[in-house]
Amino acid sequence: MDIRQDYPLSKRNTFGIAARTDWWIDYTCDADIDRLVKDEFFQDCRVQTIGEGSNLLFLANFHGILLHSEVKGITELHKDQDSILLRVGSGMVWDDFVAYAVENNYYGIENLSLIPGQVGASAVQNIGAYGVEVSQLIEAVHARHYRTGESRVFRNEDCRYAYRYSIFKEPDYAEWTIMYVDYRLRLKPSFSLEYKALAKVLEEERITPTLQSIRDTVIRIRNSKLPDPATIGNAGSFFVNPVVSAEKFNTLQTEYPSIPSYPQPDGSVKVPAGWLIEQCGYKGHRSGAVGVYEHQALVLVNYGGATGTQVGALAEEIIGNVRQKFGITLHPEVKYIL
């Protein structure tokens, strides 16, 4: 376990916000959690779990303890002719795990290449891209309650997964920190190519689908649309794509015939938040050190020196204008930390 005081966070969040935390703790195993449970100072402090800082926005310095997983490793639990069950440490970099799966011919997560963050965060956020959500592959989440020390295995159904949602986002589950995630990956060739943008590139460039070619293509597409946080601070998609009723969508389509849409199984319709933002004139918008990325309106950026409150203010401005124009309220996918 590694403990640091008055710790700078500019390199611990992909927005590059220059906040600080009173305390930063890296944990590597169950024994570290056991120590923290017995520590009176820790138990008296405000605690927030954090991964790679790729889906959050610091609005101010954090007064308390940021708890960060350094639990690593991949263990094979079971293998049959169709699938393999892997237990992965929550502190492993997500894209390193994707690369490992591709190298070992394990199918299922290749569409999720280059998504920033850790393995633990994948289970919290239910990350998704190009027609795949990680909840389709998660079998169980192993967690510890950092106040009581309780250990619990959350089966997939216990996590209540939905679009960009899991039970771990609820306040009642905020004190659970993830140790390991179990993923069941396929051993037989099987690809998810229903997503139009991905399928179009593969077809136009006559790319034969393989694990590596799909991973490479996804990485290329993502790099063409999203800025590198090492160069321009950002948290990827800032807003959740809104889901509206079929009736609401039909009304919008009458006024905006070119509006993109993704019909959902329950009859509702998902509308790209980036398209809504772009129609409000924000694509490429800049106000001082903050702005909207020129190649993807869903991405808010820090050009250097911006504060979290400045980014948040731009987000609220966008929310207001989208609501006024379309009657749709956007919700941040990024978590605000006060």
UniProtKB/Swiss-Prot annotation:
Please list the GO terms describing molecular function.
Answer: FAD binding; UDP-N-acetylmuramate dehydrogenase activity
One biological-process term from Gene Ontology? regulation of cell shape
Pathway the protein contributes to: Cell wall biogenesis; peptidoglycan biosynthesis
Domain of life assignment: Bacteria
- A Pfam family annotated for this UniProt entry: FAD_binding_4
What is one GO cellular-component annotation here?
A: cytosol
* UniProt keywords, alphabetically: Cell cycle, Cell division, Cell shape, Cell wall biogenesis/degradation, Cytoplasm, FAD, Flavoprotein, NADP, Oxidoreductase, Peptidoglycan synthesis
Top enzyme class of this protein?
oxidoreductase
Task: Tell me the HAMAP family matching this sequence.
Answer: MurB
Cited function = Cell wall formation.
Stated name of the protein: UDP-N-acetylenolpyruvoylglucosamine reductase
